[in-house]
Amino acid sequence: MSPKRIIPRQRANRDIDEAVDYYLRDAGEKAALGFIDALDRAYRHIARHPATGSPRYAHELDLPGLRSWPLKRYPYLVFYVERDDHIDVWRILHAERDIPAWMREPEGT
């Protein structure tokens, strides 16, 4: 099976920008680049093996098909839904946040 295309939503891209800004400001360029590399590895894994993500929050939030996958060495989770022809990335959130509250945040904010 060939990898599916990863399509992050606008809010997911903002999450990434915020995380990179945080690492640049508080931990330096090396940490920020490491975050980007970890996200790229997570995306590649999800593209090839979308069913391996955890469905935990799908049940908690009543969002069928929602899965999450952790970034290695960074405390972030990628939240996504597998579609027929792509992976729909909803959010990239710090694992210590109130995930249900952040997932309910409207897309336009």
Regions found by a protein language model. Name each.
Residues 1-66, 100, 108-109:
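Basic, Lys/Arg-enriched alpha-helical interface segments
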Residues 71-109:
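Enriched for short, Lys/Arg-rich terminal
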